[in-house]
From Swiss-Prot:
Protein name (record): Ribosome maturation factor RimP
Annotated GO biological process: ribosomal small subunit assembly; translation
Any one annotated GO CC term: cytosol
Keyword list, A-Z: Cytoplasm, Ribosome biogenesis
Disulfide bond annotation, renumbered to this chain: none
SUPFAM superfamilies linked: YhbC-like, C-terminal domain (SSF74942), YhbC-like, N-terminal domain (SSF75420)
Subcellular location field: Cytoplasm
Keyword Cytoplasm (UniProt): yes
InterPro entries: Ribosome_maturation_RimP, RimP_C, RimP_C_sf, RimP_N, RimP_N_sf
Native organism: Shewanella woodyi (strain ATCC 51908 / MS32)
Task of the protein: Required for maturation of 30S ribosomal subunits.
């Protein structure tokens, strides 16, 4: 069975791409009777507030027609930002040798929260070097992953 995030991604990918952007990822957060649909868009030229507003209008129209969420929700559209969330193998691969922080569903090496350097991605497995130790982590065990920006 597809998760709500997967259904939303399938539903929203084409409309976002039709506007010239990439659907970087999305989050669906349910909190009681209210939910948040957070849509991240990216573009080679950068993402501006006007882009977010345009995508928000289009996505809102699609969600109104398809009606995939039965509760009240807030729609948020933004760029991934400098501490961009990472959603899939392709995105982790793009940031090899970069530092990330991840939250896991099941502990690895006794921890659910890790910070380390992405040293490889093979299939659906991430290799993360944490304090000199190489850890192999299944991508489906990652609840949340973010790039740590260098300044």
């Amino acid at each position: 069975m597809a998760t709500i995030e997967n259904r939303l991604e399938e539903m929203l990918k084409s409309p976002v791409e039709a506007l010239g952007h990439t659907l970087w990822g999305l989050e669906y957060i349910q909190a009681g009777k209210h939910s948040v649909v957070r849509v991240y868009i990216d573009n080679e030229k950068g993402v501006f507030i006007e882009d977010c507003a345009e995508v928000s209008r289009q996505v809102s129209a699609v969600l109104d027609v398809e009606d995939p969420i039965s509760t009240e929700y807030t729609l948020e559209v933004s760029s991934p930002g400098v501490d961009r969330p990472l959603f899939n193998a392709e995105q982790y691969t793009a940031y090899i040798d970069e530092t990330v922080k991840i939250q896991l569903t099941m502990p690895v090496a006794g921890s659910r929260n890790l910070k380390g350097t992405v040293t490889g991605v093979e299939g659906q497995m991430l290799t993360l070097t944490v304090d000199g130790n190489e850890l192999i982590i299944a991508l489906d065990n990652i609840r949340k992953g973010n790039l740590i920006a260098k300044f």
